[in-house]
């Protein structure tokens, strides 16, 4: 590991790195979901970046902490406290692929939810996670 390992709250400027790390953690599931949201001329990663740059929502830079080594983003954690009571909302409006995850979230109201924990490949096996 070259450079000092530091942790800090994510900023909007980190949205691109967060989108890539979220997709790494989700093993392509986020990219699949983002592909259903993109408009013509927009890349899947741009959708992820826009979602990470939001001020609200579970996947927002406001819920993320980044790990840096030598000033370079190496990893991230996205997490937040689940609402209590937890409102599942209208499951029909949620992509079918993630409905089971939302249902499981509803089983643990008020708990701390780790949505994403991911490290870029070149920084793995260094104890960051």
Question: In which residue ranges do the predicted regions lie?
Answer:
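Glycine-rich acetyl-CoA-binding "A-motif" of GNAT/NAT acetyltransferases
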Residues: 72-75
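Conserved GNAT-fold acetyl-CoA-binding loop/helix
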Residues: 26-52, 63, 86-89
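Conserved acetyl-CoA pyrophosphate-binding loop and the N-cap/start of the following alpha-helix
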Residues: 123, 127-128
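Short loop/turn motifs at secondary-structure junctions and domain boundaries
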Residues: 55-61
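Conserved acyl-donor/pantetheine-binding loop and adjacent beta-alpha core of acyl/acetyltransferases
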Residues: 78-116
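Cytosolic beta-strand hydrophobic patch enriched in CBS
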Residues: 64-68
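Hydrophobic adenine-recognition pocket in adenosine-nucleotide-binding enzymes
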Residues: 10, 117-119
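Conserved N-terminal entry element of GNAT/NAT acetyltransferase domains
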Residues: 1-16, 24, 31-36
């Amino acid at each position: 590991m070259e450079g000092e390992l530091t942790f800090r709250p994510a900023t909007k400027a980190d949205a691109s790195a967060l989108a890539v790390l979220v997709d790494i953690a989700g093993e392509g599931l986020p990219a699949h979901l983002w592909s259903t949201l993109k408009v013509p001329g927009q890349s899947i990663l741009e959708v992820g970046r826009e979602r990470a740059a939001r001020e609200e929502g579970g996947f927002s830079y406001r819920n993320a902490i980044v790990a840096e080594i030598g000033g370079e983003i190496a990893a991230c954690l996205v997490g937040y406290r689940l609402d209590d009571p937890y409102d599942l909302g209208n499951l029909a409006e949620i992509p079918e692929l993630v409905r089971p995850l939302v249902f499981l979230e509803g089983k643990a109201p008020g708990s701390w939810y780790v949505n994403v924990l991911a490290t870029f490949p070149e920084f793995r096996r260094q104890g960051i996670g």
